[in-house]
Amino acid sequence: MLGRGEELIRLHRETNERDSATNNPAKKQQPTARTLPKAKPLISTPTMHLLILGASGRTGQLTTTTALSKSHTITALIRNPSSLPATPGLTIVSGTPLNQADIETAFASFPHPVDACIVTLSAPRETDSPFSKPVAPAMFMRDSVRNLLVVMKQHGVRRLVVMSAFGAGDSFPSLAWPLKQLFRRSNMSFGFEDHDALDADVRGAEDVEWTLVRPVMLKEGGVKPVRELGETGAKAGMFDSITRESVAGFLVGCVEEERLKGEAVVVAN
């Protein structure tokens, strides 16, 4: 136990030390240095060279634009080259996917080999109305993709993403009754028979990492969040819709993220 005199000396010493620290910045307690968390590395998607069939269609043009905006390069095989504007990163090849030789030309048109293929084909009609008379061969989409599959195999390309439709293949039972009648008893039936045949061919292809994207009713508009409703779309509503830009982004995303390989998926906004 300290005596009173010793206690006064200790208090005096502590007071002098505090005053000295206050008047001498060098002796002030320095703030503890903060260590910032390391920034997570940015995840960048490697650029790819894509072949797109159907690039001049409404959804195909948006798919092409979306892919180019992500620094991918594109080869587009189209019947009328003037239907697409010249754009950096875009190689346009004149031809039809019904001619296998034209697809082979498209594959050889760019210095870099094709990494993946996206198909946004639809059967041409007299007008933009889905009820108008078809002007393409009965199995235009199926036969085009058959040719594509042959050339893909020759070049060792495995990744294929196809824009199909809700109601094709095993998703037909999930349609509302009025839509079933519409798709099977109107001019739309030709397109769905083609989609069904294409669906079967893609599923039966060997050594192909395929994805069948089945959008519900297509409409115009910007990119919106996409709901994935499974292979058959059992929970899709009769009036569900999806914008073409949303579909375009989803198609490119499937290629970039390597998701849904060997799967079909119904998509809606």
Explain the meaning of each model-derived region:
Residues K27, T35-P37, L42-T45, H49, ...:
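Mid/C-terminal beta-alpha module of Rossmann-like enzyme folds, strongest
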Residues L50-H72:
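N-terminal Rossmann NAD(P)H-binding glycine-rich loop of SDR-like oxidoreductase domains
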Residues D170-F172, G222-R227, V255-E263:
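Glycine/proline-rich active-site loop of Rossmann-fold NAD(P)-dependent oxidoreductases
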Residues P81, S132-A136, R146-F190:
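Conserved Rossmann-fold NAD(P)-dependent oxidoreductase catalytic core, especially the SDR/UDP-sugar
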Residues L53, L77, T120-L121, L160-F166, ...:
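SDR active-site strand-loop-helix element
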Residues D199-G221:
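Conserved beta-loop-beta element that borders a ligand/cofactor-binding pocket
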